[in-house]
Amino acid sequence: MQRFTRPLFGQVLIALALGIALGIWAPDFAQHLKPLGDGFLKLIKMLIAPIVFSVVVVGICGAGELKKVGRVGGKAVIYFEVVTTIALALGIALAYAFGPGHGMNVDPKTLDASAMSSYMATAKQVESSGVAEFLLKLIPDTFVSGFMKGDILQVLLVSILFGCALSLLGERTKPLVGLIDQLSHVLFRMMAVVIRLAPLGVLGAVAFTVGKYGAGSLKQLGFLVLLFYAAVAVFVVVVLGGILRLAGFSIFKLIRFLRAELLVVLGTASSDAVLPSVMNKLEKMGIKRSVVGLVIPTGYSFNLDAFSIYLTLAAVFIAQATNTPLALSDLLLILGVALITSKGAHGIPGSAIVILAATLSVIPAIPAIGLVLVLSVDWFIGIARALGNLLGNCVATVVIAAWEKDIDRARANAVLDGKLDIIEEGEAAARGHGIQVPSASTLPHA
């Protein structure tokens, strides 16, 4: 039992079970535990912006030529668009194959629109903002605005510009680059301390959610929820697994490597909670910092694979539930609009419902009021969205690093095979005993 509870993933698993139990048997008390989950997420979000800044800046300075940075970014954008399109198409295909909305026979006029008012207001703002306005929002008002708001895209832009400027100045900036590098190590150590609180955060978040909503809200729309979970599983195993296999790695080994982070996401329904930890682990796995620093933060806004599946699946579900026929032109319009609206969804409050509302508002055939149907199960669906999005970005980072030959395959294989333990507490224990963690050059080639 001691060996099971000591690793972080074991503690999170126990907290998850306790949260469910409290939510079922002591719902009133469980709802008072919400601050535990909120506090944990706030601690994590506090560290995200400075970690992204330090990792990206040091990564760019260590990448050598700026052309290489541009090449990595270009490949990332191409990868994101191709994989996102596959995810959107999968959502439509599964909706038509299984018809989760057929037989509900919902009259849109009978639905209560009051619950959707705040979401629709935000959706109109998203819809009205064109490409030019979206690009302008990437530019912060001041150097620190992105840090203060926690806007990852703005922080990323500042980081890239700062890193490029340091790289162009050459040797004279080495002391500053070294200082920022040391800062990143301090931030990651802070993150390691905060992540130890994950069991408390998961306990609070799960207990509150189960206590407030229970499992009853799943009954009416249970098939849609199950279908979405199955869709994400198929996408991860078949699509992402196939892409990762072409790069020479196994999706199942990657999932095992990230099991602690996935359990935290399972409990909090937020991939933000593990962003710093994932960046740290991928770098320790053998991927160059420049690739991790560019792909992961960008992917959090532009590579939302599971979110993309949800957009098209939910849109067709609402059409089926309200007996709204869709022509081929409507499906192509859904695909095209969702390909645009899915970008930059990260950071918008209630982003899934808001972006779905913005998508449906452009498609007159589907009644937007049908969003009320999926509102009650959005939290449950959000768990699979967060898990799928996280795995999608981790796979993207590994694949792009493999394309660029910016991954130490010997080290990566040793880590994924379990031959090299890189979890934070293992390294801390090794340093405490004066033991050096093996470098990539000392590992046997797989």
Swiss-Prot record:
SUPFAM superfamilies: Proton glutamate symport protein. It comes from the Bacteria. The chain crosses the membrane at residues 7-26, 46-64, 77-99, 152-171, 192-211, 221-243, 291-313, 318-340, 353-375, 381-403. GO terms for biological process: L-aspartate transmembrane transport. One of its GO terms (cellular component) is plasma membrane. InterPro entries: C4_dicarb_transport, Na-dicarboxylate_symporter, Na-dicarboxylate_symporter_CS, Na:dicarbo_symporter_sf. PROSITE patterns: NA_DICARBOXYL_SYMP_1, NA_DICARBOXYL_SYMP_2. Keywords: Cell inner membrane, Cell membrane, Membrane, Symport, Transmembrane, Transmembrane helix, Transport. Responsible for the transport of dicarboxylates such as succinate, fumarate, and malate from the periplasm across the membrane. This is C4-dicarboxylate transport protein 2. It comes from Ralstonia nicotianae (strain ATCC BAA-1114 / GMI1000) (Ralstonia solanacearum). The lineage of its organism: Bacteria, Pseudomonadati, Pseudomonadota, Betaproteobacteria, Burkholderiales.
